[in-house]
């Protein structure tokens, strides 16, 4: 949902694209948004993803790199923008997000022979020696920079392994994970901060994950760069995480609401038959190894929306970027709510239930799958005929904002 030229939204009645509509009627964006992000363009893309098969391990460029990649290779990088993303779980969600803590990577190099083999004994030892005793270095310190350099060297070695080497080593990794799951990565364990049960995860859990992913992408390099190098993440309904530019991630399963800056630039690493730009991938990543809990978002109250009858709740997911935020609304049957006009354009989707939305004499019926564009400064009233759940992506900037 949005104005991106790859797949612009369309007015159901007229067939006119939203891109053409906001170009013809710039007041639908408003001067502040047009001034900050350019005319004729919503600064965000809004998506619903239902993930049955893992999506590619990937990262997205920042603004400077996005411009460089687009200029050099417009076929694979169709625009010049960055693409930070936010994912909100509608159902239980699994994914990968950012590199594991360094001590976990060292432990896996020692406990998973195929991992050390594909990296190489000398390179694995060089990594373990470089990070030993400074795994929790202060961000930006000389030790932290050395850690990131060591992690980059390790990742580069993996991503540049030959296809035959990956195929053979991954096959043996999967065979051992399947036949020796109870002893896989013996001694490896970590406390899962994002798990609902606050449980300890062990090598057995990793073995089951690897064998499951292998049924989707047999003997793929993603089994190493995702399963062993990246944090495994679980989100439960209502939880969200923010995915920064230049950090690797992947979606494994679940239903999510996703919002991102308006870009289609993707640099892929694994679990994909598509183009993998290994050189740019290796050079662009931040190699941050911060706890994944830092990327989990805390929903905020939204005082500009409130129930006028019955039970209604609104919470805001507000990432640390200017392009977008998402407002979740939940209304119980027969409840009504009022939402003040927002200072920028927005798109609302209904994911559950039925009801109606109205403003200044105009009324539209809502049902699961309804998508509504709402102009800046438009107050709306929402009424639920049955339990109603909506998500509304929007942008608000001050007139002086320049990006």
Regions found by a protein language model. Name each.
Residues 1-239, 249-354, 359-364, 368, ...:
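Active-site region of the double-stranded beta-helix
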Residues 401-403:
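C-terminal helix/juxtamembrane-tail motif
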Residues 241, 257, 372, 380:
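Conserved beta-strand position immediately N-terminal to the Walker
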């Amino acid at each position: 949902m949005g104005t991106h030229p790859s797949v612009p939204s369309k007015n159901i009645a007229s067939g006119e694209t939203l891109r053409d509509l906001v170009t013809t009627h710039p007041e639908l964006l408003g001067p502040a948004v047009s001034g900050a992000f350019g005319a004729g363009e919503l600064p965000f893309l809004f998506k619903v993803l239902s993930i049955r098969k893992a999506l590619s391990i990937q990262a997205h460029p920042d603004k400077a790199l996005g411009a460089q990649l687009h200029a050099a290779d417009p076929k694979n990088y169709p625009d010049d923008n960055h693409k930070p993303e936010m994912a909100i779980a509608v159902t239980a969600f699994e994914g990968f997000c950012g590199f594991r803590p360094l001590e976990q990577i060292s432990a896996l190099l020692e406990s998973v022979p195929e991992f050390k083999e594909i990296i190489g004994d000398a390179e694995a030892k060089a990594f373990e020696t470089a990070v030993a005793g400074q795994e929790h270095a202060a961000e930006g310190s000389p030790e932290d920079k050395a850690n990131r350099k060591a992690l980059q060297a390790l990742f580069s070695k993996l991503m540049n392994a030959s296809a035959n080497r990956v195929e053979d080593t991954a096959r043996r990794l999967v065979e051992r994970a399947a036949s020796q799951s109870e002893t896989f990565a013996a001694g490896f364990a970590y406390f899962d901060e994002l798990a609902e049960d606050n449980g300890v995860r062990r090598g057995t859990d990793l073995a089951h994950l690897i064998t499951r992913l292998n049924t989707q992408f047999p003997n793929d390099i993603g089994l190493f760069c995702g399963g062993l190098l990246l944090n495994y993440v679980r989100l439960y309904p209502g939880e969200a995480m923010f995915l920064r530019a230049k950090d690797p991630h992947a979606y494994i399963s679940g239903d999510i609401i996703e919002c991102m800056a308006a870009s289609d630039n993707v640099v892929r690493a694994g679990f994909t038959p598509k183009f993998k730009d290994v050189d740019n991938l290796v050079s662009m990543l931040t190699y941050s190894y911060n706890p994944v809990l830092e990327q989990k978002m805390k929903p905020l109250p939204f005082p500009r929306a409130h129930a006028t009858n019955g039970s209604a709740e609104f919470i805001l997911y507000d990432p640390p970027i200017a392009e977008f935020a998402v407002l979740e609304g939940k209304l119980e049957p027969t409840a009504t709510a009022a939402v003040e006009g927002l200072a920028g354009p927005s798109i609302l989707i209904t994911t559950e239930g039925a009801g109606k939305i109205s403003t200044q004499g105009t009324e539209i019926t809502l049902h699961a799958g309804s998508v509504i564009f709402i102009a800046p400064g438009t107050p709306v009233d929402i009424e639920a005929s049955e339990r109603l759940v909506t998500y509304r992506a929007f942008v608000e900037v001050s007139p002086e904002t320049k990006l």
